[in-house]
């Protein structure tokens, strides 16, 4: 397996806002439509995959984010490394669905504080009015012209997923913009 190097983002605390890199975490893209897919995924992850658009579901270990009618992003701490193998062996190998490790494609940035949604609104066309009141909501949008996935985990706290190649540019924009809100 490749030895992944994560961007060197220093934790930043500003007035009512905290920014930090939330890595390493495992990120798996799962796809499927068959009944067996949902049964196996639910049993292995001990979670029901969300079927409503722009929602997520969570338990003590795993977070599952709805991306499309047959696609989810599941993320969790690296300690559960054998989960990928279980999912792959019981779903992909049996042609019930697709399991792809995308950990090295996405970087997770955690943003929390009272000004979280002010910061996001300053660089996104998405209207966060309803989003910020619904925990476990998910959106795929643009932030400073960069594709992101945003998971609302707690009140005034989000996990923002950005492609690795855009992560440093977006991090610099976030730090700079946070000073002016």
Please provide the spans of the model-predicted regions.
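Basic, glycine/lysine-rich polyanion-binding surfaces/domains
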Residues: 1-181
